[in-house]
Amino acid sequence: MRIILLGAPGAGKGTQAQFIMEKYGIPQISTGDMLRAAVKSGSELGKQAKDIMDAGKLVTDELVIALVKERIAQEDCRYGFLLDGFPRTIPQADAMKEAGINVDYVLEFDVPDELIVDRIVGRRVHAPSGRVYHVKFNPPKVEGKDDVTGEELTTRKDDQEETVRKRLVEYHQMTAPLIGYYSKEAEAGNTKYAKVDGTKPVAEVRAALEKILG
């Protein structure tokens, strides 16, 4: 089962990716993790990636595709994989197709922008322990304080409204066109496309995914 998750940052993909991995026994392939691992391993592709990254440039689509191909040939991907953070653009999706990387399911997590802003901007973190709260959906017992230690909660830089809105604009410009792309692929019988209502509670979204994936 080869799956791509689409959806804006904060749409709940991470939570459900965890569930899919456990339920169907497939690994999550994050291009960021993959690049770091390749650089660390010192492989031929890793060296190329390191040179590009050290020069402060973006790794080319060709190189990422080559890394994806190498990664999905590994033993733990024999039953499938879950692609996270890739493809981000239509040229990347085309390159994947040309490289013969086929996908069984494309799942779109649909959540309105304002709700995403609400979800992310309301997050509060206890940095030492990694505990995460939300001012509206999962508030601490005492406002602004960690339940266990009573220490101050903070807001991550990535969770500030300006940053979130910037990431959403980027998503709509670059990644949202993939929704149309994969809808057409599904019409042509090349993959299955499903839209999931990401505004629903976690358990309901999970049940919807089970229904789609079987």
Swiss-Prot record:
Binding residue positions for AMP: 31, 36, 57-59, 85-88, 92, 156, 167
Main enzyme class: transferase
CDD domains in the cross-refs: ADK
GO biological process per UniProt: AMP salvage
Keyword terms: Acetylation, ATP-binding, Cytoplasm, Kinase, Nucleotide biosynthesis, Nucleotide-binding, Transferase
Pfam family, one: ADK
GO MF terms, alphabetically ordered: adenylate kinase activity; ATP binding
Binding site for ATP: 10-15, 123, 132-133, 200
Region (NMP): 30-59
Listed EC numbers: 2.7.4.3
Domain of life where this protein originates: Bacteria
Localisation: Cytoplasm
InterPro entries for the chain: Adenyl_kin_sub, Adenylat/UMP-CMP_kin, Adenylat_kinase_CS, Adenylate_kinase_lid-dom, P-loop_NTPase
Modified residues (N6-acetyllysine): 192
Annotated region described as LID, given as residue ranges: 122-159
Pathway stated in the Swiss-Prot or TrEMBL entry: Purine metabolism; AMP biosynthesis via salvage pathway; AMP from ADP: step 1/1
Gene Ontology CC annotations of this record: cytoplasm
Main location: cytoplasm
Family statement drawn from the similarity comment of this UniProt entry: Belongs to the adenylate kinase family.
Oligomer and partners: Monomer.
Domain comment (free text): Consists of three domains, a large central CORE domain and two small peripheral domains, NMPbind and LID, which undergo movements during catalysis. The LID domain closes over the site of phosphoryl transfer upon ATP binding. Assembling and dissambling the active center during each catalytic cycle provides an effective means to prevent ATP hydrolysis.
Protein's job: Catalyzes the reversible transfer of the terminal phosphate group between ATP and AMP. Plays an important role in cellular energy homeostasis and in adenine nucleotide metabolism.
Protein name: Adenylate kinase
Annotated gene: adk
